[in-house]
């Protein structure tokens, strides 16, 4: 079989930078799926992407499908011929459909009888005749939320398409993609290199485009170059560049010929909190800030341009002129905001509605303040500082800086609190109240910060559930899932002695008559249980372990964590699955019991050696188990219970539980109930698989 390398490039207008990687990866995955469905072999495949192009290279692609034999079974021989040995209508119809006569059919003998069989040789189709259709289907499946039309064309895509190049080796693959006919012309850089290039071979795509077109279509190489050049530029300044990956990805997607340059701004702007300057540089301008070894912002920034200039200083000056007014705005907002304290802004919070049924932001901070103080008493934090931080937690929403740069809420609260003479614990709590903001974000660890962060999230959760606006499907306008995960992570990662039932009840009490949904506490608790499951699944804990713990519905996050770890460890023991099966058997037996069982086991009614042994073993373990369960030491307790495996196995082998004698039966059921109760102190291990 012969092989060749394939190139497919779609040349477009500038693609959305934040979607570029996803589009390219999806294009590749979709196309390789098409190749597999078509049974076309290939060695490897890679994607390329630049602002005005999506491309894929497939290496060592088979030039045709392999020939194959397809077996088509017909009717059973017994039904294929009549009593005189003549073909029946069913047999003739089947044969005709396969282009043969009944006499030409083979026979297939099986254990169930003999059948007519046609072995059809299917000649493989040439790859080049399949490529265009496969590529079009691959493009049709791209994640494009809002496709657009252009010109008089009815074709839709994420951006207008100008060129399509499909080369199988040196041969142009005939066909159209998105209404554009395939040829070997690719476009170079808008302002450098050749505007259009005739590509001779698929293998030369990257090199020709780079050398003649001044376009580096290798996304990862472009990203690595930007990163290396930016690090080197920062080192020359005696600092380190903030090369956050999301921004690095976005900048990589904005340029096809990256040139890294360094610029500066006036040192006076460093009097403004660094976060505001960084937000302006990164968010608005896509610049990389530079910090010294102590983490202090330097009056410099690094940016990436898309052109090699004969006079780079002109580009540098232009970017400095662009950023200066933005930094001046931040300076003005900061100086203006400093004239009023956070406390003085509380009255203005009365004019801002949090949610129609839940009142104003002022009412919200009063609830958060009370809730934070309540939590503080449970975890040993300073309740006065917690209450103060809760009260001031939303005051920065009324500042000019946060109104202009909304992502700085909390952060600016911290800076203004310090200027107002608030304690450091209060100031830091204002900054950390929204943590964790995203998956992988850190959680607050300072006691006052913990109190405010928990109070803020619980107020939202209980309030929104309390007015009947729980999340439905993927819709979650109040980010309740993130809030719930945040509560759990803060409790778990700080090993806090808090119970969700108690926290929910306190939050409900503080909302007072605002809430109209009587079932809110139960619904919020159930919501947390769902988040527990999602959280532990993300940590790689098997579903059966999670379900075993969920069956006991522990409501203290730290306790839930202890049980999860214990059951996960128990599951690795040699005795685990046998005891899980035994517990399931016990559960099924007890589920059928009507009426109450004896509260205690009557030793006089233990007649079989196996039941005596099990009862004795249980009696021996119970004094050891009680303090372990009381201390939530579930792992040691389950390890002790694992020693029951032999006694339990022997019991079920030798003892008839449902004895004819009612007293014996009830006593044995009581024994099994006692056995199961011990395991249920930790989890329902009958759910382990």
From Swiss-Prot:
One of its GO terms (cellular component) is cytosol. SMART domains: DALR_1. It catalyses: tRNA(Gly) + glycine + ATP = glycyl-tRNA(Gly) + AMP + diphosphate. One of its GO terms (molecular function) is ATP binding. Keywords: Aminoacyl-tRNA synthetase, ATP-binding, Cytoplasm, Ligase, Nucleotide-binding, Protein biosynthesis. PROSITE patterns: AA_TRNA_LIGASE_II_GLYAB. GO terms for biological process: arginyl-tRNA aminoacylation; glycyl-tRNA aminoacylation. Signal peptide: none annotated. It comes from the Bacteria. Its EC number is 6.1.1.14. InterPro entries: DALR_anticod-bd, Gly-tRNA-synth_bsu, Gly-tRNA-synth_heterodimer. It is found in: Cytoplasm. NCBIfam families: glyS. Belongs to the class-II aminoacyl-tRNA synthetase family. Tetramer of two alpha and two beta subunits. This is Glycine--tRNA ligase beta subunit.
């Amino acid at each position: 079989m012969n092989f060749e390398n394939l190139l497919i490039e779609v040349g477009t207008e500038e693609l959305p930078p934040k979607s570029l990687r996803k589009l390219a990866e999806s294009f590749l995955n979709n196309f390789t799926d098409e190749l597999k469905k078509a049974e076309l072999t290939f060695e490897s495949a890679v994607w390329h992407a630049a602002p005005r192009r999506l491309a894929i290279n497939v290496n060592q692609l088979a030039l045709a499908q392999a020939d194959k034999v397809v077996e088509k079974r017909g009717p059973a021989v017994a039904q294929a011929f009549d009593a005189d040995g003549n073909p029946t209508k069913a047999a003739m119809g089947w044969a005709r459909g396969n282009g043969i006569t009944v006499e030409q059919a083979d026979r297939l003998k099986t254990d169930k009888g003999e059948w007519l069989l046609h072995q059809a040789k299917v000649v493989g189709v040439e790859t080049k005749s399949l490529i265009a259709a496969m590529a079009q289907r691959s493009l049709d499946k791209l994640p494009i939320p809002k496709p657009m039309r252009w010109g008089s064309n009815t074709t839709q895509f994420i951006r207008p398409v100008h060129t399509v190049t499909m080369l199988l080796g040196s041969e142009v693959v005939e066909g159209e993609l998105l209404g554009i006919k395939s040829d070997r012309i690719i476009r170079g850089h808008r302002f450098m290199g050749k505007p259009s290039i005739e590509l001779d071979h698929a293998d030369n795509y990257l090199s020709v485009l780079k050398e003649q077109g001044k376009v580096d279509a290798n996304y990862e190489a472009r990203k690595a170059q930007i990163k290396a050049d930016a690090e080197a530029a920062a080192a020359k300044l005696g600092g380190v560049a903030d090369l956050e990956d999301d921004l690095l990805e976005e900048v990589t997607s904005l340029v096809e010929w990256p040139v890294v340059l360094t610029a500066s701004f006036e040192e006076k702007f460093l009097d403004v909190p660094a976060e505001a300057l960084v937000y302006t540089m990164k968010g608005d301008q896509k610049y990389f800030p530079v910090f010294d070894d102590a983490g202090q912002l330097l009056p410099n920034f690094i940016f990436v341009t898309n052109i090699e200039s004969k006079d780079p200083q002109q580009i540098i000056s232009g970017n400095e002129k662009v950023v200066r007014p933005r930094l001046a705005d931040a300076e003005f907002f900061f100086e203006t905001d400093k004239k009023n304290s956070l406390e003085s802004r509380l009255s203005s919070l009365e004019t801002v509605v949090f949610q129609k049924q839940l009142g104003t932001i002022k009412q919200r901070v009063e609830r958060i303040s009370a809730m934070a103080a309540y939590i503080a008493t449970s975890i040993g934090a300073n309740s006065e500082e917690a209450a103060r931080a809760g009260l001031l937690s939303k005051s920065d929403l009324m500042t000019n800086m946060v109104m202009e740069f909304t992502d700085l809420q909390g952060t600016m609260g911290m800076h203004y609190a310090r200027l107002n003479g608030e304690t450091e614990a209060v100031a830091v709590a204002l900054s950390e109240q929204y943590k964790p903001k995203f998956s992988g974000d850190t959680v607050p660890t300072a006691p006052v910060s913990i109190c405010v962060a928990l109070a803020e999230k619980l107020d939202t959760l209980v309030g929104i559930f309390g007015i009947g606006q729980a999340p439905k499907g993927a819709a979650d306008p109040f980010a309740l899932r993130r809030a719930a995960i945040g509560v759990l992570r803060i409790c778990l990662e700080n090993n806090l002695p808090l119970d969700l039932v108690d926290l929910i009840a306190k939050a409900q009490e503080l909302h007072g008559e605002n809430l109209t949904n009587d079932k809110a506490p139960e619904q919020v608790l159930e919501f947390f249980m769902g988040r527990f499951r999602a959280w532990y699944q993300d940590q790689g804990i098997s579903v059966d372990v999670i379900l075993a713990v969920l069956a006991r519905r522990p409501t203290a996050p730290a306790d839930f964590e202890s049980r999860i770890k214990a059951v996960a460890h128990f599951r690795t023991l040699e005795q685990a699955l046998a005891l899980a099966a035994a517990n399931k058997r016990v559960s099924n037996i007890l589920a059928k019991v009507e009426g109450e069982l004896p509260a205690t086991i009557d030793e006089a009614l233990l007649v079989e050696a196996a039941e005596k042994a099990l009862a004795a073993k249980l009696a021996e373990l119970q004094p050891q188990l009680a303090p372990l369960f009381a201390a939530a030491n579930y792992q040691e307790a389950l390890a002790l219970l694992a020693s029951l495996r032999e006694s339990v196995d022997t019991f079920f082998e030798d003892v008839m539980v449902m004895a004819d004698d009612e007293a014996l039966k009830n006593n044995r059921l009581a024994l099994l109930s006692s056995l199961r109760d011990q395991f249920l102190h930790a989890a329902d291990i009958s759910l382990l698989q």
